[in-house]
């Protein structure tokens, strides 16, 4: 195999590893939402324990990127792909972390929130939007689809709206009954993590735009 063909093969393997990691992070978020919906503390614990797998995948991808950079002197297009992978891997890892963060809250949350709690239902609906953003961002990354990436960025407005609406509901809840502060704070942390997951999906989408254009947040890089 020629040096160029080997290099192309290594780049494709890097992309495959990145997509697989994204799928694992998305699954962790989906499972966290399901555990929240069903008050399943055992499932929540499994999510926390499974976070190491995503962390290990991050280290593997970072190693692949550094190997590609050290073994070759990539031209602009290749360098954009490697640089994007090094940035995106951090956002994906944080998505997995936030799924684990939510899972850690669930055992206490289910003791202070009744089944069918409307604020929890709103948080789950918000989370499903953030989860869909992950799927769409990873699809955009796989296809290097700038238009799809733009849709992910736009979708974040709905997640932010939900975050502010639920936060307002929780503030009213505390004002009406200060004894509910723990229950409110637990859910506030959950929606904050969900909001951050949406932000990380946006970051992935913005790096997709960079791969296609060489511009990141409207600034030319290379």
Question: What feature does the model see in each segment?
Answer:
Residues 1-222:
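Cytosolic, long alpha-helical scaffolding segments
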């Amino acid at each position: 195999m020629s040096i160029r063909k080997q290099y192309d093969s290594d780049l494709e393997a890097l992309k495959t590893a990145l997509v697989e990691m994204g799928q694992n992070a998305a699954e962790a978020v989906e499972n966290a939402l399901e555990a929240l919906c069903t008050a399943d503390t055992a499932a929540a614990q499994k999510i926390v324990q499974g976070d190491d797998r995503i962390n290990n995948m991050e280290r593997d991808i970072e190693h692949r990127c550094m190997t590609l950079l050290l073994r070759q002197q990539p031209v602009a297009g290749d360098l954009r792909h490697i640089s994007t992978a090094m940035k995106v891997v951090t956002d994906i890892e944080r998505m997995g972390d936030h799924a684990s963060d939510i899972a850690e809250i669930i055992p206490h949350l289910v003791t202070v929130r009744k089944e069918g709690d409307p604020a929890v239902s709103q948080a789950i609906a918000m989370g499903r939007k953030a989860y869909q953003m992950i799927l769409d961002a990873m699809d955009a990354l796989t296809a290097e689809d700038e238009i799809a990436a733009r849709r992910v960025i736009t979708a974040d407005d709905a997640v932010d709206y939900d975050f502010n609406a639920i936060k307002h509901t929780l503030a009213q809840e505390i004002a009406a009954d200060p004894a509910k502060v723990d229950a409110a704070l637990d859910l506030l942390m959950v929606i904050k993590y969900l909001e951050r997951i949406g932000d990380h999906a946006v970051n992935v989408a913005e790096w997709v735009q960079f791969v296609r254009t060489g511009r990141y947040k409207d600034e030319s890089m290379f």
